[in-house]
Each structure stands twice: as C-alpha cells, then as structure tokens.
Amino acid sequence: MKLYAPYGSEGFNLYIDGVMDSIAKRFEKLFSRDELSALVLGGGYGRGEGGVLHLADGTEKLYNDLDFFVISKQTNPWKNSQISLKLKHLHHELSDEYGVEVDFSACMPINSLDKLPPYLIWYDPINGYQVIWGNKHALHTVPRWEANDLEPVEAVKLLLNRGMGLYFSRKYLSLEKPEPHLDFINRNIHKAYQAMTEAILIVEGQYHWSVKERMRLISIPDIGKYLSNPAFLDLAQAGMDFKLKPYLPTESPEELKERLSQTLIDFEELYYAVWAAFFGVSNLNLDTYHRLLASYKDSENSLMSLAKNFALNLRDIGLSPGSLNEYIKYPRYRLFYALPWLLFDAPISLSNLAPILGLAHGADAESLRQRYVSLWQRYN
C-alpha cells in the first residue's frame, strides 16, 4: 500500500490509491502515449504528507488539493491547446467528484525538464512524487537542487500568493453572513503561517521539502530578524500541523476576525523583512520598497524573455508614458508594487496605482481591487 496521508487510516490510503487508479484510467481513455509521457502526482499526497480531515462521525476525507504535473512529448502548439482544453474539462469533473480541487499543470515537454530552473513549484515534487500514469522515469532528468539553490525571489512569490488568501479571507469576513466561508478563512490563516515559515527557511538557505522537517528547522534561525511576535513559532508549528491534520473551525466569525488581524500584522512585518533580505538591506519602508522594486531586474533577462515580458505588459496595460524598465519586467512586478495597498492598506494614491495595474486615471478603489485580482489570477 502506498502512503499518501500519514495520519490517515489504512482504509483511507487505500481509498486514495483507488482515486489514483480511477484518474489514471480516465487519462488512458483521453490521451495517447504518443502525445503525453506521464501524469505525476505532486503536492502533499505525492510526497506522502497529505492531509486527512477526520469528521465527528469517524469519516475520513480528502482535504488538500490533488496537484498533478502533466509531462508531454514534443507536440505542436495546436495539439497542446487541445490537450489543455481536455484537462480543463477533466479538472471540473474530478473536482466535483472528489470534493477537492484536482489541478493539472500546463504541459511540460519531457525534453525540457533537464533545463528547469530551481523554482519552488518543482523543488518539492522532485523530492517526493508518484507517477500514476505513463513513463515511471519521466522526472529523472530534472536537476536535484539543494536548499541554497532556491533564490529569495521564490520566498516573495510564495508570500504574494498566500497574501491573496488573506485578502479573500478579509473580504469574506466583511460579508453580512460569513459563516459559509469560515473553513476557507481558517485554512488561509494557517497557510499564511506555513508560508511565513517557508519564506524564512528559503532566505536562510535551510528550506526542506518535507513538512515534518520544516517543523524542526524553523526553530533554528534567529526569528527576531523577521518577526517580533513572540508567539510566532507556536503559530508556525500549528500551521504546519494543520497541513497534515486539518480540521473544521469551531470559532465564531468574530474570533476568526481577531486571528486574521494578528496574522496580517505578522504577515506585513515578515513580507518587508523578506524583501529586505532579497534586496540586501537592513530594513524597508514603503518608499524604499517601491524604489528598489523599480530598479530590480529579472534574473531571466535573455532577449527572448525581455521581448515576452514586453508583449505581456503591452497586452495588460497598453502603451503608456513611463519607463521602458517597467515593460521589460515580468508582469508580476505590478502585483508586488500594489500588494501593500491591497493587503496592508498602505497609503498609495489611486492615481499612481491605476497605470501600474493598467486602468485609466480616475479608476476607483473597487475597480483597482478587481483588476488586481484578475492580474493575479493570470500570473499566479
């Protein structure tokens, strides 16, 4: 029996085995081995560290997303678009069937895997995965990186995505009836502390693919360099524990609002501390953050990368007066620029935000928030 969830029963792990078999059979019907090489389960379940939700009646349920990497043969763009369309339909079918998000990556050509850069999205799965369909050796050419190969930019990318979970949590808590969203809010508070832990370990060169090992390693660095909250280590441990043993919250909306408020305070402090480490300065304020961000150049600066960035920015915001430097950065730069306003209520004028996010001068705050979310969904 394969181990997917360490705190799940033998029956639960056998159930997930059956889910994998079922998905593999769907794949076999939909795709030819001439076009796709392998379907690989990553994420917590792929590493053998998936979560199990124990309900009051003794039932065990999937809780984490099922994250799959799709490894393709060398195919033309038209064929890839056809595959992507099938995967999109399959995502919706399987997510509805199993009650969790079943996500498929974009197709990754097998002959490009040896050239992958050390991104966090690949660091974890290459250290723990399961091929459920196709070539069992499909990932053998992916480089085996060390923790210090992960650049600090991986930490700030992670914080951007987890920050959006906090943004949506705050939005849900402002609703007249937030009760249907309490699980989402509790989950994203824990995920924020997971991300803060992981960001510190990345910057310190001590990141590890295993959740259990990260729980041990986070006690080693001088946390005071990043956060002043003396309870952070306990919150970090609780966040990591939640990854393995999730639960449904019993707190009231008001109690969750109080937890979220403290989480945002910690997250803001950590966010700027990680960026300070990224830029090699002792501390940051908003003005310094924006100035250094404006002068930052992407590490991927080949002529092809710069041309691609220019085309993406041109599509998103059109051609407007400003620095060429803004157009040749990957568009995620615009999200970093505006995140302190969106998440921390930083005093950035709407007239400055509008051109950054590709809206006309005079755009109101709600339009800017909606625009930010749409850009984040595009570049997440």
Spans of features found by a protein language model:
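Sparse recognition of residues in long alpha-helices and their boundaries
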Residues: 43, 55, 201, 208-209
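Non-catalytic terminal regions of proteins
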Residues: 275-380
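N-terminal regions immediately upstream of nucleotidyltransferase
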Residues: 1-33
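Active-site nucleotide-donor binding segment shared across nucleotidyl transfer reactions
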Residues: 24-66, 72-75
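A generic structural motif
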Residues: 72-78, 199-200
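Short alpha-helical scaffolding segments that buttress acidic/His motifs in well-ordered protein cores
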Residues: 236-239
